Amino acid sequence: MDRRDFLDLLAKGTSLGLLLKLAPLGMLEFVRAQSSATSFQKALLVDKAGNPFKLSTLKPHEPFVFAYPFAATPNILVNVDAELSPVEVKMPDGKNYRWPGGVGKGRNIVAYTSICPHAYSYAAPNLGAMGYYKPEGNRGPRMVCCAHLSSFDVTRGGEVRGGPAPHALAAVALEYDAAKDEAYAVGFLGNPQFDEFFRAQNQALRNLFRTTARAREEVSKATVIPYAEHTKVPTTCPVLG
């Protein structure tokens, strides 16, 4: 199936789940078909021992972190304990895109960049400005940046629910192998703003990685670790929206 066929079927309303089964390139082809998406080097998610990470081992609402596509750009991976369907995510520049929903056997697993699109605060190893907040009362699960209280709905493609963030949180595109219960990161949906992030965090990243080249090194395998092990000082703050 080529890109034109893929887009034609998507426009005709063919289910995304079926398309990803039909398309040989799966999620990677889906990313390339989006107007607001970026593909990067494909990276297998692995555990600390280097073995393929099994998505079914994720417990509900316990966040994990993996660096992708660069050594210095952490993402948050979490089981939200609910099946998530595709949604249309609106962008201020008009380059809206289709978020494919959750992955995994229960379609309940999502991954997003931890870099806030407002001022590029993130889940740094020394201070976790961006974190995951499990559902509470009538509020669903959120990712929140405690720097300026931007809140993002992880069940709806990372759309903004509160705070000054100008657009949705970029979602990691995960290609899931159901037979092996493994996943590959293949790119991002939305605008991850990596160039802006590296400029804003230049000195801090040099302190962590010694050189910009090391910070920007692309990963071929993405090691998944608990959020609590990645970030020495997590932050908590009110959840807006």
Region locations from a protein language model:
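N-terminal secretory signal peptides and thylakoid transit peptides that target proteins
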Residues: 1-18
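Hydrophobic membrane-targeting alpha-helices
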Residues: 18-26
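N-terminal pre-ligand scaffold of iron-sulfur
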Residues: 28-132, 176-241
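Short beta-strand-alpha-helix junction that forms the catalytic/metal-binding core
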Residues: 106-112, 136-145
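Detector for the c-type heme attachment site
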Residues: 119-121, 147-151
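Polybasic, low-complexity binding patches
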Residues: 129, 136-141, 154-186
